A protein has these predicted regions:
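Long, low-complexity, Lys/Arg-enriched
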Residues: 1-50, 66-114
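Gly/Ser/Thr-rich loops at beta-strand to alpha-helix junctions
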Residues: 54-64, 84
Length: 114
């Protein structure tokens, strides 16, 4: 089993723009992964690439780089910064622009109640 768990959560920004929230979690006991762990890591099925994707989780910069690359077909890609919100780092639409900060509240996990 891969030590990087990915979850896609349908969500929307505070302004009501729909997007998909890609949350990752590192499941090792010490919270450490190796570069080899991204080999074969696939995005969850059912992602709607006609919407944007916000990536969120605590992990190394090279994991973020890999996930941004994998999410490239999406309308836009943002990285969550807890101090700012979602910072758009790539876009294929006029809806948002690179460097734009989208305000959002973190969604609950799909499997959680409430």
């Amino acid at each position: 089993m891969n030590p990087i768990q990915l979850e896609v959560i349908p969500h929307q920004t505070q302004e009501g723009m729909p997007y998909q929230h890609l949350r990752f979690q590192i499941t090792t006991d010490d919270g450490v992964i190796a570069p080899a762990d991204i080999k074969g890591l696939k995005l969850p099925e059912g992602i709607q690439f006609n919407q944007g994707i916000v990536i969120e989780g605590k992990g190394p910069i090279w994991l973020y780089g890999y996930l941004v690359h994998e999410c490239h077909p999406a309308a836009w890609v943002g990285c969550y910064d807890p101090r700012l919100g979602a910072v758009v780092v790539a876009t294929h639409t006029h809806e948002v622009s690179v460097s734009q900060v989208l305000k959002l509240e973190l969604p609950a996990s799909v499997g959680s109640k409430g």
